Design a protein with these regions (language model features):
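A short coil-to-beta-strand element that immediately follows conserved catalytic motifs
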Residues: 59-68
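Structural detector for helix-capping/boundary residues
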Residues: 36, 50, 63, 116-119
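A generic structural micro-feature
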Residues: 1-3, 30, 81-89, 107-110
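Structural motif
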Residues: 18, 63, 86-92, 113
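Active-site-adjacent beta-strand/loop module that shapes the phosphate/pyrophosphate-binding cleft
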Residues: 71-102
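Conserved Nudix-box catalytic region and its N-terminal flanking loop in Nudix hydrolases
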Residues: 17-54, 58
C-alpha cells in the first residue's frame, strides 16, 4: 500500500470567505483547500505554508491543528493508474493570510485560486476534503 501525507489550510478572511484552489489533476476540475504533499523531512506546518504560497501567492501564519483525515483509496479508484491502494493522511490547519497577493499557480496541480462566500462554496464542484475540513473548523 502506498502512503501520501499532505497538509492543507482552512483560510478565511474577515468577511468569512474561504480561500480555495482549483485542482486540475483529478478526474474532473474541482475546488479544494490550498495545500499538498509533504516533501521528505518537511514538517506539516512548513508544508502547508509552502503549498499555500505556491498555489495562491499568499504567505500565512499557521494556526490551530483542526484534525487529521485518513482515507484508503482502492487501487482502481486512484487518479493515477496503480496496482496498490493509496492511504492518504491529510493534516488540516487553520491559517491566516499575513502577506502576499493573490495569484495563480503555474505548472502545478492547481490553476486558479479564489475567495468564496460559504453559500457560493456549497454550489461549487469541490473535493470532499473541503466539507470535511469545514466541519473540523466548526464552519459547517
Amino acid at each position: 500500500m502506498d502512503l501520501r501525507v499532505a497538509a492543507y489550510g482552512v483560510v478565511t478572511d474577515e468577511g468569512g470567505r474561504l480561500l480555495l484552489a482549483r485542482w486540475t489533476e483529478g478526474r474532473r476540475l474541482a475546488w479544494t483547500l490550498p495545500g499538498g504533499g509533504l516533501e521528505p523531512g518537511e514538517a506539516p506546518e512548513d508544508a502547508v505554508r509552502r503549498e499555500i504560497r505556491e498555489e495562491t501567492g499568499y504567505t500565512v501564519r499557521v494556526g490551530e491543528l483542526l484534525g487529521i483525515h485518513s482515507r484508503v483509496i482502492p487501487a482502481g479508484r486512484r487518479v493515477q493508474k496503480a496496482s496498490e491502494p493509496l492511504h492518504t493522511l491529510r493534516v488540516v490547519y487553520r491559517a491566516e493570510v499575513t502577506g502576499g497577493k493573490l495569484r495563480y499557480e503555474t505548472e502545478g496541480s492547481t490553476d486558479r485560486a479564489e475567495w468564496f462566500s460559504l453559500p457560493a462554496v456549497a454550489e461549487l464542484q469541490r473535493v470532499r476534503l473541503v466539507d470535511i475540513a469545514l466541519r473540523m473548523a466548526g464552519i459547517l
